[in-house]
């Protein structure tokens, strides 16, 4: 990744904050992923445990470089909200009724309860030089990082969503 310094920088920031390479308690596993899109660079580290088919998300670390940053607190809030929406994506799916997508608004989405929200830590590493998004780029690496952590725990690759179709539920 030496030819992609922005990608590597957020990956390293997430890995450092997420204690990548440090031992975890028995039964807890990590996954990591990196993403570039919406004009930003982001990476995530997920920590999970799996008991049977129940997945417990213990911790999420998300690093974001959106270029210029006006409000670090607002960026952190957007990234954290992206995790909530990502959990919804992980566990639910769109349905078609009368030839239309049914889940067209928040009242029809399976938004997670507070009990399903993990500890979310953000690393904001704006470098300036460009204006990037902050909502979607936080959600994008979270899902593959979590799926990689499930793989580390179970040996089962998750290639399609929602997780419930793979036999998993959130603990």
PLM regions: where:
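Cofactor-binding beta-sheet edge motifs in enzyme active sites
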Residues: 1-171
């Amino acid at each position: 990744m030496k030819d992609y310094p922005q990608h590597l920088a957020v990956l390293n920031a997430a890995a450092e904050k997420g204690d990548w390479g440090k031992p975890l308690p028995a039964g807890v596993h990590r996954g990591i992923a990196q993403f570039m899109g919406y004009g930003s660079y982001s990476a995530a580290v997920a920590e999970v445990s799996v008991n049977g088919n129940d997945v417990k998300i213990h911790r999420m670390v998300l690093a974001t470089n959106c270029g210029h940053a006006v409000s670090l607190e607002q960026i952190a809030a957007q990234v954290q909200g992206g995790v909530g929406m990502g959990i919804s994506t992980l566990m639910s799916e769109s349905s078609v009724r009368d030839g239309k997508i049914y889940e067209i608004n928040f009242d029809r989405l399976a938004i997670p309860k507070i009990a399903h929200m993990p500890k979310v830590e953000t690393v904001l590493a704006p470098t300036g030089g460009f204006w990037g998004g902050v909502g979607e780029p936080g959600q994008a690496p979270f899902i593959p990082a979590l799926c990689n952590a499930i793989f580390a725990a179970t040996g089962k690759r998750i290639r399609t969503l929602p997780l419930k179709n793979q036999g998993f539920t959130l603990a």
